[in-house]
């Protein structure tokens, strides 16, 4: 019967001969390109060249970026140093301005302190009312001195000290048997420090050392030199 007849198997060679493609079976070996195959080497070589070129390009870009980083870092360091110096200079200028304003203000107050000092030394209040008024002035003076002390103002102690032009202003000089030369023997106006710096120089009287033995003159020894021509003149007259 035609329906039950099985189709005979076709020979692969016959199939190829008839122009049909052979059917691959799972057991057929897979052809792989050989490393020694010139065709495969030709396919790999361009890819390797592209990778090397890309690597060289990346290395150049890395070098360029590293150089730019070094330049920018140097600029940043200079800008940071300049800003730090500017900040320090501004802070120093502000401190100097503050000190100048403080010194200017305190210099206007010091004459008031001088007046209190003179009043305390000269006044001799008599009677209960005068003494009460004197105590009131002394209380004001003490408050003023305390405020100055809180601001960093301190009086100089100059009597008996060696004369120092950076601290003292010599108003008078006189001979003194009790003090050697260039020693302060009297304070004429008190000097003050402000936080260790001179706020006002002290006006002082300075010793010139012991005077002449006969006490006839307080001038240095220029006077005997003035008498020398007179002695020469007298001897000349005697010879004549």
UniProtKB/Swiss-Prot annotation:
One Pfam short name: GrpE
Region annotation Disordered: where it falls in the sequence: 1-54, 206-240
Keyword Glycoprotein found: no
InterPro entries: GrpE, GrpE_coiled_coil, GrpE_head
Any single biological process term in GO: protein folding
Subcellular location(s) of the protein: Cytoplasm
Keywords: Chaperone, Cytoplasm, Stress response
Biased composition (Low complexity): 215-233
Keyword Nucleus (UniProt): no
One Gene Ontology term, aspect cellular component: cytoplasm
GO molecular function terms listed in the Swiss-Prot or TrEMBL record: adenyl-nucleotide exchange factor activity; protein homodimerization activity; protein-folding chaperone binding; unfolded protein binding
Taxonomic superkingdom: Bacteria
HAMAP family per UniProt: GrpE
Subunit (UniProt): Homodimer.
Entry's family note: Belongs to the GrpE family.
Known role: Participates actively in the response to hyperosmotic and heat shock by preventing the aggregation of stress-denatured proteins, in association with DnaK and GrpE. It is the nucleotide exchange factor for DnaK and may function as a thermosensor. Unfolded proteins bind initially to DnaJ; upon interaction with the DnaJ-bound protein, DnaK hydrolyzes its bound ATP, resulting in the formation of a stable complex. GrpE releases ADP from DnaK; ATP binding to DnaK triggers the release of the substrate protein, thus completing the reaction cycle.
Name under which the protein is recorded: Protein GrpE
Lineage: Bacteria, Bacillati, Cyanobacteriota, Cyanophyceae, Synechococcales
Gene this chain is encoded by: grpE
